Amino acid sequence: MSESKLNLFSFSGKTRILHLSWFAFFLTFFMWFNHAPLIASIREAFDLTDQQVKMLLILNVALTIPARIIIGMLVDAFGPRRVYSILLFTSSFLCFGFAFADSFERLAMMRFLMGFVGAGFVIGIRMISEWFPARQVGVAEGVYGGWGNFGSAAAALSLPTIALMFGGENGWRYAIMLTGVLALVIVALFLEEPEGHMAEVLPDGTVQMIEVT
């Protein structure tokens, strides 16, 4: 890690971890707010009242603050790669549960539990700090935070169109299911990566433990 500049166009070693991390963060926000741009269709499907819609929006963020503390503790105990993988895996099935919901109560429960996905950004901060030296960590975390936060905007821009492409009264369900599928893809990619604690991936795929300075 002797280079002083970060090559963002590289897709190997620590830069690959950066790209996986920001996309994982992106997906957490994409899933966390996947219901918001589709709320009109959800309201129509379940004949929701204004109060019920407000409740779904509130429940979606209710767990986030305690979740960030809990996720931080888990990262300290088990490492960021494992925790990110588990969070995305669990959140994908919460997306499926929301998409297949057949009552307001089921919708509300899934949205409440989805508050945990808002803690995803905590994991990446730790992961980036482990993979990048001090002279690069600021830029790396800027890329991580900047692109990751775009997830909620991307959901608002893309999911209504995706729902229309699927068509029919269940288009919104398929659009939300798709966000869960994307999360599973990232989980599979994460599980192929090394733990990364002060590590450098060599060209032959082996991991060399080094001191990050």
Predicted ranges, named:
Residues 191-213:
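Flexible cytoplasmic inter-helical loops of multi-pass small-molecule transporters
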Residues 144-196:
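Helix-loop-helix hairpin linking two adjacent transmembrane segments in secondary transporters
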Residues 33, 61-69, 119, 153:
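Residue-level signature of mid-helix packing/kink "hotspots" within the transmembrane helices
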Residues 16-50:
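Extracytoplasmic
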Residues 110-147:
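Cytoplasmic helix-loop-helix junction between adjacent transmembrane helices
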Residues 103-111:
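Short hydrophobic/alpha-helical segments at membrane-entry points of transmembrane helices
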Residues 94-98, 114, 190:
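MFS-fold secondary transporters
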Residues 66-104:
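Conserved MFS/SLC helix-loop-helix module at the cytosolic interface between two early adjacent transmembrane helices
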